[in-house]
């Protein structure tokens, strides 16, 4: 028998150096052939190694029926591995006891190999189990998908935290989706770092002067200033800037080495009085580059008068010859003065785990998985052509490519000489060569855009804007030259990019193109492109194409061009986030597909892990990555559904650290991580059934109900919970409320069959909201069948119930009173609900349907008070005067701050009335500085009114939802669902502000007393420079009411 090597980490093709800082809780998986070892003499030391050669080495079963044995069936190394079988619960597995062996706050690395015998990919998870003075708790550390019959190494950094001396600490390896297969574990190792510190290669606090820093741009001034400092007494002051790229710079050539990743830190400060964007950028040129590149390391919003840290990483590939590496600081505001302090550059080779990992060879190729549906594309920076790992990942998964920047006008234009444009095609030609070598097609991006086009392109030799005739000829020359150069090599072009602005009267962006040529430039661009290459497919490309107003403008534009034979398709960019409602994307695809003969390309797909524009995670939260994956699965289900019109889906970036989104803040928007490993978002496309359940979140209002099978008004105050079937259709809509120790639930279920003993609903409540792989004593569930029979897991729980029959549907109501529990406002409980149809379960949160045995995947409900106001019946005169009738109804105030503060920004006191024809709103706005200079109406001093007539509180706008806006000069503008025909307003300026009176015509309901609608009112505050500095509403602190009615409050109509 060959003995296993002790003292090694078999990190298949992985090189690990350094400590674990910054990687805690993130799974890192290596791939490839086994056999490359990292010796203990490097910066990691091993203190636990389980080889399972002839025995279980102390590993124990987790789960009452689980059997673990040393087995010779298969082995990653040596002749034995640990066999795990007879699992009956999804969280059953093998437990590695580390009690007394690890310390709180210390960084560790778990490494193990796993092999599974099912016939499809399976999800594996690692849990940390802790028992200490705080009690027993479980935390999921990592998720990784493993293909059948393949030894996969999984690496899991962890750092335990104990309260007092722990009675138990262990790690559990399990496969939490299915139990009907055997898996094996081998080479379990736990390592900890030896002493090692980061290597600082450059650092300055400017206390000793400017050093090697230089002004960037003519006339720019840099100086040492004692006025402000992040540390010490001095900082670097940058002034007299005239362009965005002007700033302060330092050459790092000779300091930074090839084949290394560096961490950059700096602190920046500005005092303009407004938020500003300041950017840390690397200017670089390798001998293989045809031109100098400018790559953001980090951009951040910097509030006035605050020091903000910019931090990011930058990698210099091995094997390149460096000609220029210059670090500089810039701002999108070309005249902004700013300060820089405490700049530091760290060689992370000695500061982190660095995994030199290869693309996973064993996973399916995306282009093969989707070959019957559409091409799979990827947007590429030119640096991939010198990186063999990049090339391997691209060629395995993609059959279409797009130049990320190198086919845009500013990359192709080299100047103008004697009135003729000069071009540079060297870098762009590399994309053609690469595609041809790897069996790929090329999408050209982009010909006509308001951005990344040089200013001189629109001007004559004297700096004056060209005439329409001159601009038309320049457009013709540019398109004929570029498209002609790539004729027969680029199969599709984004001819016009981002020309639509739904806030303009004609729906078109007021770009320099429009300024000179009016709307004609769009049609001419397509005409010239068709002339230059009749066989190329021509597309109009834009972002947020799913927003209803913008969608409709694009539809009309493209339909007109299609009827003229000038266009072939629509490019839907799909730069989306976790806040995006995927149903709106399907509605857009559905509408666009009605244009005869149209093609659709998904041109720039990525999914941010954020819901807002301000958060910034140091590491991607597990729940965000799971939600991202579920969004991706939804998307590709839709893309496949419409594959008769969708012919190309392109990801905007190869892997997370190459994404444009990661330069602005930490983000992980793509399907491969920075180490070339497939994320859950990849498996969402290939095998969505393996995804971990996405624990849902919602909120319910306080209230009581009489359980008689009718939806009391109290239920209307809570956001509905929807359960979907396999096709994405709503299976059930459920509302819950809480009071004291009782949860009330009312629901309506779609069910075409009548099988009383096999149809029903199940409610699961986890009062302490602790997640465990078993039920705790307080966990409660009730199953109610449509024959009125029920199953309750606790004898002391009081249940009242009602089932109401209907045609192809039924309703139910329950109250569940749990003794010894007192629910409280602003607390959280675990919760789930499932619909049972003909014996099949459809769950809201735990899609493994294992709620009866564990609470790991229950959803979370926040218990809230009631956000409700009343509107009295009455009809005012809309004239800007405050009629006496307004004093008969309740006054509410805008106090939910999304931007600014209650003390410094505009707020309003609001009253609401109603009659059979209209909803009436009076807003008395406190705002001493009034401005409407901004071209965006939402950034002017204005009042916005949001209504949700059916109060469904969906996460997207239904037909009854609407957003109305009026500024202090009585100029109206509209969001989704609103129109001038429904909106009558009057505005009066008063000392210190203005009064708004508005009437909004009902659209879908006939109101009556006790009707409850969704409602919000928002005040936008602009400063004297026309910048929006305040957003304060009645009910929504997230500033998402414009797209998400679930943020609205409740308005009850009374007599």
Curated annotation (Swiss-Prot):
What ranges does the record give for the region A, renumbered to this chain? 30-357
Name its GO BP terms in alphabetical order: xylan catabolic process
PROSITE patterns this protein is in?
Answer: GH10_1 (PS00591), GH10_2 (PS51760), TAT (PS51318)
Tell me yes or no: is Signal among this UniProt entry's keywords: yes
Spell out the Pfam families in the cross-references.
Answer: CBM9_1 (PF06452), CBM_4_9 (PF02018), Glyco_hydro_10 (PF00331)
Per annotation, the relation between temperature and activity is:
Optimum temperature is 102 degrees Celsius. Thermostable.
Residues in domain GH10?
A: 360-688
Instruction: Give the residues annotated as active site.
Output: 498 (proton donor), 604 (nucleophile)
**Residue ranges annotated for the CBM-cenC domain, each copy included:** 720-851, 895-1040
- Specify whether Repeat is a keyword of the entry: yes
Signal peptide range in chain numbering:
1-29
Which reactions fall under this protein's catalytic activity? Endohydrolysis of (1->4)-beta-D-xylosidic linkages in xylans
SMART domains, alphabetized: Glyco_10 (SM00633)
GO MF: carbohydrate binding; endo-1,4-beta-xylanase activity
CDD domains associated with the record: CBM9_like_1 (cd00005), DOMON_like (cd00241)
**What superkingdom does the record give?**
Bacteria
> What are the UniProt keywords, alphabetically?
Carbohydrate metabolism, Glycosidase, Hydrolase, Polysaccharide degradation, Repeat, Signal, Xylan degradation
Write out the domain note. Answer: The C-terminal CBM-CenC domains mediate the binding of XynA to microcrystalline cellulose. CBM-CenC 2 alone can also promote cellulose binding.
Q: So what family is this one in?
A: Belongs to the glycosyl hydrolase 10 (cellulase F) family.
Q: What is this protein called?
A: Endo-1,4-beta-xylanase A
Name the gene behind this protein: xynA
């Amino acid at each position: 028998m060959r003995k296993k090597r002790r003292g090694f980490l078999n990190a298949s093709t992985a090189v690990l150096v350094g400590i674990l800082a910054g990687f805690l809780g993130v799974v890192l998986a290596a791939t490839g052939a086994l056999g490359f070892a990292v010796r203990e003499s490097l910066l990691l030391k091993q203190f636990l190694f389980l080889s399972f050669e002839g025995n279980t080495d102390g590993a124990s079963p987790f789960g009452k029926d689980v059997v673990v044995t040393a087995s010779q069936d298969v082995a990653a190394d040596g002749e034995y591995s640990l066999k795990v079988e007879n699992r009956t619960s999804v969280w059953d597995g093998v437990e590695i006891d580390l009690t007394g062996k690890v310390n709180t706050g210390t960084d560790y690395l778990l490494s193990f190999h796993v092999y599974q015998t099912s016939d499809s990919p399976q999800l594996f998870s690692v849990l940390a189990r802790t028992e200490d003075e705080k009690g027993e708790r479980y935390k999921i550390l990592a998720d990784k998908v493993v293909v059948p019959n393949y030894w996969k190494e999984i690496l899991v950094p962890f750092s335990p935290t104990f309260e007092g001396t722990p009675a138990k600490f262990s790690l559990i390896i399990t496969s939490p989706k299915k139990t009907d297969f055997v898996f094996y574990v081998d080479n379990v190792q736990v390592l900890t770092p030896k002493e090692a510190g980061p290597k600082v290669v450059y650092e300055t606090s400017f206390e000793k002067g400017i050093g090697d820093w230089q002004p960037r741009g003519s006339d720019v001034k840099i100086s040492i200033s004692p006025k402000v400092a992040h540390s010490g007494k001095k900082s670097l002051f940058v002034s007299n800037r005239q362009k965005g790229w002007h700033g302060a710079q330092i050459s790092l050539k000779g300091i930074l080495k090839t084949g290394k990743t560096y961490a950059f830190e700096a602190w920046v400060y500005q005092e303009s009085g407004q938020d500003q964007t300041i950017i840390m950028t690397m200017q670089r040129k390798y001998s293989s580059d045809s031109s100098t590149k400018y790559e953001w390391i980090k951009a951040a919003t910097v509030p006035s008068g605050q020091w903000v840290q910019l931090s990011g990483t930058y990698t210099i590939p091995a094997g390149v010859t460096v000609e220029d590496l210059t670090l500089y600081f810039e701002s999108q505001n070309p005249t902004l003065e700013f300060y820089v302090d405490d700049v530091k550059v760290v060689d992370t080779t000695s500061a982190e785990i660095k995994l030199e990992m290869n693309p996973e060879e064993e996973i399916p190729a995306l282009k093969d998985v989707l070959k019957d549906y559409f091409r799979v594309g990827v947007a590429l920076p030119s640096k991939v052509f010198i990186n063999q790992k990049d090339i391997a990942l691209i060629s395995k998964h993609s059959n279409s490519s797009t130049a990320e920047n190198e086919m845009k006008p500013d990359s192709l234009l080299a100047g103008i000489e004697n009135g003729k444009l000069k071009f540079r095609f060297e870098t762009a030609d590399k994309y053609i060569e690469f595609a041809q070598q790897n069996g790929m097609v090329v999408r050209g991006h982009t010909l006509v855009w308001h951005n990344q086009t040089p200013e001189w392109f629109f001007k004559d030799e004297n700096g004056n804007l060209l005439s329409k005739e001159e601009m038309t000829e320049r457009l013709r020359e540019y398109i004929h030259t570029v498209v002609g150069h790539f004729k027969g090599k680029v199969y599709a072009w984004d001819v016009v990019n981002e020309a639509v602005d739904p806030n303009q009267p004609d729906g078109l962006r007021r770009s320099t193109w429009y300024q000179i040529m009016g709307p004609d430039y769009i049609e001419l661009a397509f005409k010239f492109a068709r002339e230059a290459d009749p066989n190329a497919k021509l597309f109009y490309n834009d972002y947020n194409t799913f927003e209803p107003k913008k969608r409709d403008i694009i539809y009309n534009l493209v339909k007109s061009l299609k009827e003229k034979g000038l266009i072939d398709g629509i490019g839907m960019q799909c730069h989306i986030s976790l806040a995006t409602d995927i149903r709106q994307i399907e509605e857009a695809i559905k509408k666009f597909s009605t244009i005869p003969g149209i093609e659709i390309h998904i041109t720039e797909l990525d999914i941010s892990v954020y819901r807002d524009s301000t958060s910034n995670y140091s590491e991607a939260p597990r729940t965000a990555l799971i939600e991202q994956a579920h969004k991706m699965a939804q998307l590709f289900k839709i893309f496949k559904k419409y594959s008769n019109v969708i012919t190309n889906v392109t990801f905007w970036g190869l892997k997370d650290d190459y994404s444009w989104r990661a330069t602005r803040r930490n983000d992980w928007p793509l399907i491969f991580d920075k180490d070339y490993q497939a994320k859950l978002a990849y498996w969402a496309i290939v095998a969505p059934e393996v995804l971990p359940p996405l624990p849902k979140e919602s909120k319910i209002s306080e209230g009581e109900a009489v359980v008689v099978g009718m939806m009391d008004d109290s239920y209307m105050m809570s956001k509905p919970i929807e359960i979907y079937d396999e096709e994405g259709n709503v299976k059930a809509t459920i509302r819950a409320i809480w009071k004291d120790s009782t949860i009330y639930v009312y629901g309506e279920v779609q069910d075409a069959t009548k099988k009383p003993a096999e149809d029903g609903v199940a409610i699961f409540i986890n009062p302490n909201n602790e997640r465990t792989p078993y039920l705790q004593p307080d966990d409660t569930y009730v199953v109610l069948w449509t024959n009125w029979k029920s199953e309750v897991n606790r004898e002391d729980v009081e249940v009242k119930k009602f089932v109401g029959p209907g045609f192809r549907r039924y309703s139910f109501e329950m109250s569940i009173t749990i003794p010894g529990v007192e629910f409280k406002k602003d607390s959280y409980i675990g919760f789930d609900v499932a619909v049972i149809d003909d014996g099949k379960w459809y769950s809201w949160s735990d899609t493994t349907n294992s709620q009866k045995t564990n609470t790991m995947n229950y959803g979370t409900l926040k218990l809230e008070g009631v956000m409700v106001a009343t509107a009295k019946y009455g009809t005012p005169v809309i004239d800007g005067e405050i009629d006496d009738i307004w004093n008969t109804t309740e006054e509410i105030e805008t106090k939910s701050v999304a931007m600014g503060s209650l003390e410094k920004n505009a707020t309003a006191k609001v009253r609401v009335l109603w009659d059979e024809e209209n909803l009436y709103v009076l807003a008395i706005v406190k705002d001493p500085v009034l401005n409407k200079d901004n071209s965006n109406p939402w950034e002017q001093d204005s009042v916005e009114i949001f209504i949700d007539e059916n109060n469904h509180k969906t996460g997207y706008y239904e037909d009854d939802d609407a957003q109305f806006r009026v500024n202090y000069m009585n100029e109206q503008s509209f969001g989704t669902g609103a129109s001038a025909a429904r909106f009558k307003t009057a505005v009066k300026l008063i000392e210190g502000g203005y009064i708004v009176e508005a009437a909004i015509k009902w659209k879908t309901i006939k109101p009556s007393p006790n009707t409850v609608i969704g409602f919000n009112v928002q005040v936008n505050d602009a400063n004297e420079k026309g910048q929006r500095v305040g957003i304060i509403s009645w009910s929504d602190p997230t500033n998402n009411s414009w797209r998400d009615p679930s943020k609205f409050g409740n308005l009850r109509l009374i007599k």
